[in-house]
């Protein structure tokens, strides 16, 4: 058996594989906190946002806008770029994950589409790079205006099962500029069937029309299939 992530020390946490990390989170019974950190600007010179988040109690750190093919975290000095994630794990004592965005070139956009680098996009190369860098988990989601769809998230999960050994999180915090439901029972089932470990959904009240009833129904579906649910605030209400 594994130690709860809220009780585990650094050496225990960083030894966990994807399956063990999932069980460690499950055993913590809803008290696990993940902090998403933008890596392009440090909060303070020579100090990463991840270190600050860990100091304030984050159990998991998720890097946003991180390019897996050009690894760099502002505020972090490393001898070699390939050691970026390992050093951040050592400094924070936390599992480190990365956002990869399953962009849909055919998406019906509600706003101007933003172009992102290949190292931020969900593809075989970026997933293998995430594996080589030592990330503990990946999160398939979309930043505003990137054109990420639930259809492509499900496809990315299937690809990740063949190219990444860590925990897999899947879902949208907001629309990512696309005209489709942010979270639905149908898309959740697709993510689970594809092999997702954790389903990401928006917190109630953070996006228009996502209700408590919908969240409860999704949680029941995910738990029935042995998965976990992460309720997120990714739209600045925090």
Where are these regions (language model features)?
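Active-site-adjacent beta->alpha loops and helix N-cap segments on the catalytic face
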Residues: 10-26, 44-47, 69-88, 144-165, ...
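Acidic (Asp/Glu)-rich catalytic clusters
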Residues: 26, 50-57, 82-93, 127-134, ...
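Hydrophobic faces of well-ordered beta-strands that scaffold small-molecule active sites
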Residues: 31-37, 61-63, 94-102, 138-140, ...
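Active-site mouth loops of central-metabolism enzymes
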Residues: 31-48, 102-124, 170-186, 230-238
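Non-catalytic, usually N-terminal nucleic-acid engagement modules in DNA/RNA processing proteins
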Residues: 36-102
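Glycine-rich phosphate-binding active-site loops on the catalytic face of alpha/beta enzymes
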Residues: 59-71, 132-146, 190-208
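Hydrophobic alpha-helical segments and helix pairs
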Residues: 106-159
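Catalytic alpha/beta core domains of metabolic enzymes, predominantly
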Residues: 198-238
